[in-house]
């Protein structure tokens, strides 16, 4: 009898979490787009502009071209993203951090907090080296993500990502928190695919397409031929 009760309890809990998982993964309830979406920053980035509280935004910088694209995106939407905002800046190389620090000086009203993330995988790394760095990144990123997510509670917030594989780890931790802690609400993860991806998505894009709340591409061909759930607003960077 006790075994039957325990089995029933496990089944109920498992069913509840499956339903919750379906609810937090936008892929299951987002319709495919067929036309160009309105290039409206509020709709594009899912921000509650009417809120009187400052926006809390997490931005992750990859390296090289990814950093350049992210900075141009922030600059193009500066009125929405950088107006009296609190920016949580994640980075994996010092050059990107310095580049952002130089850029953000123009917006003295923004508060910035820096978080260094290990790279999920180094270029030309062996399998063993990759496994080691991935485990280290998982642990370190979990600590950072938990701190940042709880700091955002009660305020309009956004996780803005593009580029490297570390974005996958960050997104997965956020979705796990949504799954286990429903009262936290949505993390509002927006992933912007690189301008260089015209016909096929990046490996990171292929993974995050199933996970993030909003997936944005910059070429119609990519949306129409490969990623029907994505949004296309034209060139953003």
Curated annotation (Swiss-Prot):
InterPro entries tied to this protein: Oligosacch_biosynth_Alg14
Keyword Transport (UniProt): no
Xref: Gene3D superfamilies: Glycogen Phosphorylase B (3.40.50.2000)
Lumenal topological domain: 1-7
Top-level lineage group: Eukaryota
Stretches of the chain found on the membrane's Cytoplasmic side: 29-237
Protein topology in the membrane: Single-pass membrane protein
Keyword terms, alphabetized: Endoplasmic reticulum, Membrane, Nucleus, Transmembrane, Transmembrane helix
Entry's transmembrane regions: 8-28
Family classification: Belongs to the ALG14 family.
Self-association and partners: Heterodimer with ALG13 to form a functional enzyme.
Task of the protein: Involved in protein N-glycosylation. Essential for the second step of the dolichol-linked oligosaccharide pathway. Anchors the catalytic subunit ALG13 to the ER.
Note: Present with 339 molecules/cell in log phase SD medium.
Classification via PANTHER family: GLYCOSYL TRANSFERASE-RELATED, UDP-N-ACETYLGLUCOSAMINE TRANSFERASE SUBUNIT ALG14 HOMOLOG
Name used for this protein in its record: UDP-N-acetylglucosamine transferase subunit ALG14
Gene for this chain: ALG14
